[in-house]
Amino acid sequence: MRHLLSTRDLSRDEAVRILDVAEDMADVGTREIKKTPALRGRTVVNLFFEDSTRTRISFEAAAKRLSADVINFSAKGSSVSKGESLKDTAQTLQAMGADGVVVRHPSSGAPHTLAGSGWIDAGIVNAGDGTHEHPTQALLDAFTIRRRLHGSAARGKGLDGTRVVIVGDVLHSRVARSNAWLLTTLGAEVTLVAPPTLVPVGVGSWPVTVRYDLDAALRDGAPDAVMMLRIQAERMRAAFFPNPREYARIWGLDDARLALLGPDTIVMHPGPMNRGLEISAAAADSERSTVREQVANGVSVRMAVLYLLLSGDGKADR
């Protein structure tokens, strides 16, 4: 694997391999010393042109647990804020000897541009580009679902027949896009539920079912997992729904809807959460919730991605 730019690029075998290596990395996390020398001598640069806390910290923790050297680059206060181009930044990192670059950028397609430009000879990981994709978030979501379904017998398995309902601001969600492609590649059945104003143009070409009635989707679909998406108000330049209270009433996972879910249905959220809007406090804190698991699993999955990207070997050094 040379780059990770989109879940759409992954075959089923490649996706399962990443999840299986992530299981090895999760084992590393249970040790007294949570480190492996797998990427000793390698340099990973976290190149973030957008604000981020959990994703950047997760990638930093992942690289350090693999014994890589980590450089954190923020656009604020850097030469980028003075007008430096992506090309010049990439060539600077090339001169510094970066082996892997984790990129978050407000423009959709920026990681693809970097990977195909020839400006830098490094493995590129897309950590979120505009409203396009967020591949490692989808991988950690799939990892979380697979672990909940199969436990210790998860290795080598996909998500065949698993029913996943993704609810909320699909229009602005790179998480929804990446999950739509990855989960279906792994064999899951994916249903998107959103207000009509928050469904993107072209969704008919996605391998999903689209519905607008959350109660009907939960009742008829008997989902194994319900994933609530954050309302991304910072990306909205118009009114996409009447008001927050109305949104929560029609499309939020409240206590009443939580009580109607099947006994083994899990509740997911990529974070950060707007409690009381897309998800109630009771749902977020319930035993069904995988929110904290997703954060922990994110480190293991990102370790797997960096390992496969920079070592070229599918077997983790135990």
From Swiss-Prot:
Disulfide bonds: none annotated. One of its GO terms (molecular function) is aspartate carbamoyltransferase activity. It catalyses: carbamoyl phosphate + L-aspartate = N-carbamoyl-L-aspartate + phosphate + H(+). The keyword Transferase applies. Its EC number is 2.1.3.2. L-aspartate binds at K82, R174, R230. Keywords: Pyrimidine biosynthesis, Transferase. The keyword Isomerase does not apply. Gene3D superfamilies: Aspartate/ornithine carbamoyltransferase. InterPro entries: Asp/Orn_carbamoyltranf_P-bd, Asp/Orn_carbamoylTrfase, Asp/Orn_carbamoylTrfase_sf, Asp_carbamoyltransf, Asp_carbamoyltransf_Asp/Orn-bd. Carbamoyl phosphate binds at R54, T55, R104, H134, Q137, G271, P272. One of its GO terms (biological process) is amino acid metabolic process. One of its GO terms (cellular component) is cytosol. HAMAP family: Asp_carb_tr. Catalyzes the condensation of carbamoyl phosphate and aspartate to form carbamoyl aspartate and inorganic phosphate, the committed step in the de novo pyrimidine nucleotide biosynthesis pathway. Belongs to the aspartate/ornithine carbamoyltransferase superfamily. ATCase family. This is Aspartate carbamoyltransferase catalytic subunit.
